[in-house]
Curated annotation (Swiss-Prot):
Protein's organism: Homo sapiens
Location relative to the cell: Golgi apparatus membrane
Region of interest (Catalytic subdomain B), ranges: 664-726
Positions annotated to bind Mn(2+): D588, H590, H723
Lineage of origin: Eukaryota, Metazoa, Chordata, Craniata, Vertebrata
Name under which the protein is recorded: Polypeptide N-acetylgalactosaminyltransferase 5
Chemical reaction(s) catalysed: L-seryl-[protein] + UDP-N-acetyl-alpha-D-galactosamine = a 3-O-[N-acetyl-alpha-D-galactosaminyl]-L-seryl-[protein] + UDP + H(+); L-threonyl-[protein] + UDP-N-acetyl-alpha-D-galactosamine = a 3-O-[N-acetyl-alpha-D-galactosaminyl]-L-threonyl-[protein] + UDP + H(+)
Recorded topology in the membrane: Single-pass type II membrane protein
Homology family: Belongs to the glycosyltransferase 2 family. GalNAc-T subfamily.
Stretches in topological domain Cytoplasmic: 1-12
InterPro entries cross-referenced by the UniProt entry: GalNAc-T, Glyco_trans_2-like, Nucleotide-diphossugar_trans, Ricin_B-like_lectins, Ricin_B_lectin
Keywords: Disulfide bond, Glycoprotein, Glycosyltransferase, Golgi apparatus, Lectin, Manganese, Membrane, Metal-binding, Phosphoprotein, Signal-anchor, Transferase, Transmembrane, Transmembrane helix
UniProt region (Catalytic subdomain A), positions on chain: 495-604
Residues the record lists as Phosphoserine modifications: S292
Pathway where this protein functions: Protein modification; protein glycosylation
Length: 940
């Protein structure tokens, strides 16, 4: 111990302290150096990982684990391999760390993608350059919203293009013989699913041959909005990045219809991924198994809902005297299946709770590509359609033909609750469209050389180019003319069903068929209760047995035949009385419904049963049959004497109220030919006035009735229907056409215009002079009282305030220009005296019926005596009518005179101040005592 102590005496203590400090310093230095090395290694690893992520480099420690997406991206090892400042050991450790990170990344991606591959091992890219023909836009018009491209613009892109949902390109599909091509897109909130099955075929198959042999062309878009699950869906999007296995919009998938592959589909039934919050769908399995597509030239609808009454009972058409039952109708009551191996049917199997969930990772994928996919086996195609999540299994088999359309295929995708989905974009045909056919895509058609005389001769058949109409396919495609944003609008899942009512008489065959096909092809089948064709006693032979036979292929189409000519109004009433749908949708028989036309109409009626929804009526040119769009900001109006017309909303009003193209427009008067109305509300209003004859004025009557009795009329810009506008009506009238229309208008005026009916008569004075027999109005006036309808003045102030509707043409004191004196009443005579605007006996009105009246008394001439007297007012008494400010056409020099019109010689009102009396004398344009003016004048 003493020996040790001596080392710490004197200088020894210093040496010991230095030694200990050196050891401690060395330890800290070594630790710092180790930390520095570790930090450098970590930084290098991170930089290498980032660099390799950018260049697509993947280290492949095991060639058996090579993933397809990295084969073409193989790179040499890192530069400086085997070298470095830390020696071989540090380099080896660094490389092992990098390899471990890369292996983990590859393993994670492989697991994620193999999970989506339904256990089939090999993963095949889902997009591939395709040879699909895109729909063209109207000539000389380039669409910029992505809904259409020029015919020459074929899709040969190498990568799918991201677009918005509304910009999904319209694509025609090609399939091998015996293959049904189905394109179904499902949107749920912010996520989407595209299903487009195609039959597999060899790479050497001829595309043109496939186009000629395809059987079915179906385009269906479906989207549902699930607000409660939106946040969970977003979280899952972040947790599961989009995989290349998700198909893009516009892609078509091929499904082989073999027994082995059908078993493969069923074998994977239990593999549905339930990690994402999907809505649950339920459907009647027995009903679904029975439904199929009837192989007909162009399409069919379900018979189940075709002709049932409100209590689910089949409607016996023979019970109505308005209906003639054909043999085809009786046969449809008990359809029999006929064996036909060529007939294909498509129907979904039962949707299990976990299998009925449709979703994809991003809404933009819904319409991101117009490419056809590579040929894929059934199992991988099924994976592609679901993105690894199995929805309802699609079973494709060969069955006997049926007359039922698979409406539940769409309906099953909609939740049964009161949620919402995006408007369905449906365009269904059972035979392929020829893109080179005349008039295809709404293009104009030119009469072939040498056929001009025939076309001119046939013009009279329909007062439009019937020759060209017969050349155009009855199911031609037309451009989607809806404003941008309509495709994303939400509608409720539980919309009411509708009965579409078309009345016709001697309609052109091709035009009538095109109208029916446009409804069938572009309407959600679960919303169409029936299509009622009301034949108003047509005389054309082709509209009898031939029409019955043709329409027998569509179970939801019913033909009601009137036994005598009743006219459009009563024909529509017959259709309404036989309709079984919740909503009545009236259409003309020369229309073409555009995509997405029906749901926006039914949505407005669903929101309020007192709303009457009208589509935007676009133009089908009567000369070249081209489909032309119209201004989005138009509304129906009328001018006196109740002449219907269209008026564009002024730009300053649009800017001030920030009206968008997709906003509904309040419509004072509807055109009357195309609209949807709740059936029960229609009958509550008393339907059309049954006293109206044939055609004309019914749109005015129903418009006034709806607005004044608590309803609303709206134009829905997202619903578009083309209509052939003709310069003349080709249909015959039992009586004189003009008198029939005028009689109807007089009947409407007498019931609904109140005191403003004088304004109506003032613009058509001959109407009151003719003394038209308008029939008994008691029932209609009692109906107005029962409904507690508002006045026509309320209508003008609240619905149509921009209509000029002064009750009188002029009012106030009536001044003699030369004398400066005013007409006044003294006792029972008419005199001149000093003007006094506050004196009631000097206040005169010049009415629209050309009476000069003060209260109930009117100024009347006594031509024989040249005097003037007072007479009780009578609108029909021609001896009380004067012309003032309205003689400019015939006698412009007498424009400031007051002229008695009912006399062979023109007599004018003249003042005589000396005697304070009035008289009538021969008109003299330069005589100042015959010039008069009212205090105020009004225009209408």
């Amino acid at each position: 111990m003493n020996r040790i102590r001596k080392f710490f005496r004197g200088s020894g203590r210093v040496l010991a302290f230095i030694f200990v400090a050196s050891v401690i310093w060395l330890l800290f230095d070594m630790a710092a150096l180790r930390l520095s090395f570790s930090e450098i290694n970590t930084r290098v690893i991170k930089e290498d990982i980032v660099r390799r992520e950018r260049i697509g480099f993947r280290v492949q420690p095991d060639q058996g684990k090579i993933f397809y997406s990295s084969i073409k991206e193989m790179k040499p090892p890192l530069r400086g391999h085997g070298k470095g400042a830390w020696g071989k050991e540090n380099v080896r450790k660094t490389e092992e760390s990098v390899l471990k990170v890369e292996v983990d990344l590859d393993q994670t991606q492989r697991e994620r993608k193999m999970q989506n591959a339904l256990g089939r091992g090999k993963v095949v890219p889902l997009w591939h350059p395709a040879h699909l023909q895109t729909l063209p836009v109207t000539p000389n018009k380039q669409k910029t919203d992505g809904r259409g491209t020029k015919p020459e613009a074929s899709s040969h892109q190498g990568t799918p293009k991201q677009t918005t949902a509304q910009g999904a390109p319209k694509t025609s599909f090609i399939a091998a013989k015996g293959t049904q091509v189905v394109k179904i897109s499902v949107h749920m909130g912010r996520v989407s699913l595209k299903q487009e099955p195609r039959k597999s075929h060899s790479p050497s198959s001829d595309t043109s041959k496939l186009a000629a042999e395809r059987d079915l062309n179906v385009t269906i878009s479906l989207s549902t909005d699930r607000p409660k699950q939106r946040s969970q869906a977003v979280a899952n999007e972040r947790a599961h990045p989009a995989s290349t296995a998700v198909p893009k919009s516009g892609e078509a998938m091929a499904l082989n219809k073999t027994k082995t592959q059908s078993k493969e589909v069923n074998a994977n039934k239990h593999k549905a991924n339930t990690s994402l919050p999907f809505p649950k769908f339920t459907v009647n399995s027995n009903r679904l198994r029975k439904q199929s597509i009837n192989e007909t030239p162009l399409g069919s609808l379900s018979k189940d809902d075709g002709a049932r009454g409100a209590h689910g009972k089949k409607l016996n058409f023979s019970e109505s005297h308005l209906v003639i039952i054909t043999k085809e109708e009786e046969q449809k009551a008990d359809p029999k299946e006929v064996s036909n191996s060529k007939t294909k049917t498509i129907f979904p199997k039962v949707l299990g709770k976990s299998q009925s969930k449709h979703i994809s990772r991003n809404r933009s994928e819904m319409s991101s590509s117009s490419l056809a996919p590579h040929r894929v086996p059934l199992s991988q195609t099924n994976h592609a359609l679901t993105g690894g999540l199995e929805p309802a299994k699609i079973n494709i088999t060969a069955k006997a033909p049926s007359t039922e359309y698979n409406q539940s295929h769409i309906k099953a995708l909609l939740p049964e609750d009161s949620g919402t989905h995006q408007v369905l974009r449906i365009d269904v045909t059972l035979s392929p469209r020829d893109p080179k056919a005349p008039g295809q895509f709404g293009r104009p058609v030119v009469v072939p050389h040498g056929k001009e005389k025939e076309a001119e001769r046939r013009w009279k058949e329909g007062n439009f180019n019937v020759y060209l109409s017969d050349l155009i396919p009855v199911d031609r495609a037309i451009e989607d003319t809806r404003p941008a944003g309509c495709a994303e609008q939400l509608v409720h899942n539980n919309l009411p069903t509708t009965s579409v009512i078309m009345c016709f008489v001697d309609e052109v065959w091709s035009t009538l068929l095109r109208s029916v096909h446009s409804v069938i092809n572009r309407s959600p089948p679960h919303l169409i209760k029936e299509i009622l064709l009301v034949d108003d006693f047509s005389t054309k032979d082709y509209l009898k047995d031939n029409l019955d036979k043709y329409m027998s292929q569509f179970p939801k189409v019913r033909i009601l035949r009137l036994k005598e000519r009743h006219g459009l109004i009563r024909a529509r009433l017959a259709g309404a009385q036989n309709a079984t749908g919740d909503v009545l949708t009236f259409l003309d028989s020369h229309v073409e419904c555009n995509v997405g036309w029906l749901e926006p109409l039914l949505e407005r009626v669903y929101l309020s049963r007192k709303k009457v929804a009208c589509p935007v009526i676009e133009v089908i040119n009567d000369k070249d049959m081209s489909y032309m769009t119209v201004d989005n900001f138009q509304r129906g109006i009328f001018v006196w004497p109740m002449n219907f017309g269209w008026r564009t909303i002024p730009p300053d009003v649009i800017a001030k109220n920030r009206i968008k193209e997709t906003d509904t427009i309040r419509c004072p008067v509807m055109a009357g030919g195309l609209f949807s109305i709740d059936k029960s509300y229609f009958f509550e209003l008393g339907t059309y006035d049954p006293g109206l004859d044939v055609w004309g004025g019914e749109n005015m009557e129903l418009s006034f009735k709806v607005w004044m009795c608590g309803g609303e009329i709206e134009i829905i810009p997202c619903s578009r229907v083309g209509h052939i506008f003709r310069n003349d009506n080709p249909y015959s009238f039992p009586k004189d056409r003009m008198k029939t229309v005028e009689r109807n208008l007089v009947r409407v005026a007498e019931v609904w215009l109140d005191e403003y009916k004088e304004l109506f008569y003032g613009h058509g004075d001959h109407l009151i002079d003719q003394g038209l027999d308008v029939g008994n109005l008691t029932q209609q006036r009692e109906l107005r009282k029962k409904l507690k309808c508002k006045s026509f003045k309320w209508y003008l102030e609240n619905v149509f305030p921009d209509l000029r509707a002064p009750i009188v043409r002029a009012s106030g004191v009536l001044i003699n220009v030369a004398l400066g004196k005013c007409i006044s009443i003294e006792n029972t005579t008419v005199i001149l005296e000093d003007c006094d605007g506050s004196k009631e006996l000097q206040q005169f009105n010049y009415t629209w019926l050309r009476l000069i009246k003060c209260g109930e008394w009117c100024i009347a001439p006594i031509p024989d005596k040249g005097a003037v007297r007072l007479h009780p007012c009578d609108n029909r008494n021609k001896g009380l009518k004067w012309l003032h400010k309205s003689t400019s056409v015939f006698h412009p020099e007498l424009v400031n005179h007051i002229v008695f019109e009912n006399n062979q010689q023109l007599l004018c009102l003249e003042g005589n101040f000396s005697q304070k009396i009035l008289k009538v004398a021969a008109c003299d344009p330069v005589k100042p005592y015959q010039k008069w003016k009212f205090e105020k004048y009004y225009e209408a």
